[in-house]
Amino acid sequence: MPSRELARRGRFDTLDAMRALALVILSVMASTAAADPCTEELSARHVAWKKASRSGIANAVEITGPLGGVTVSAVDHALVIDCSLAVSLAEAGRYFVALGIDHVNFSSAYSRRNVRGTNRPSKHSYGLAIDVHTFTGPELGSLRIDRDYEQGLGDTVDCVGAPLTQGGAVLKVLQCQLVRSGLFHLVLSPDYDDAHHDHFHLEVKPWGDRPELRSTTQAIH
């Protein structure tokens, strides 16, 4: 067989081998993605999402629909967070809905920055935290943390205390519910410090460090 023909066949054999290898790699990637336990949990909650990529986020997802019946949005950017936080928000949706809330506005989710006054990266840097500030519903109207949250209420026996306004009561009940649900590692409010005067900071642990996936706590309202 002429050497030119042998060379041509050799190139074809190499291309076939490369195609076969590419198919194997794609198959492995697809099976790995399908087996991801966090996104499986997210899909099981009927959340619309798509895979995303952000520096620092271990399992980034972009949320494209409601979370547990609640739309979570910002004015100028999409909600891209770690899947672990997305599952918590979806699971917590029923607590918002029980209080008449169907829309939540956030001011910050994924953001590369340090904890105020330190050199330690904030959990926002990993997509594991979100700051929510406005809550709306068809009967509720619009509630804002900086305007309607009543500080200094409740104690270790009675978390809610005695709010003076309906808006204050809704926000305090929501805070207590989110704390007692166990779905969030941290829930910080204006009672924590002045830096949180206008929002609730909700933070979770990475998926592999979480002891529970669901909350069995009943909604209080």
Name the predicted role of every residue range:
Residues M18-V24:
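Sec-dependent signal peptide recognition
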Residues T39, W49-T64, P121, Y126-H221:
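Catalytic cores and adjacent binding grooves of peptidoglycan-active enzymes
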Residues D36-S107, S111:
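Active-site acidic/histidine clusters and adjacent loop/turn architecture
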Residues R94-P121, V173-S189:
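Conserved short secondary-structure elements within globular domains
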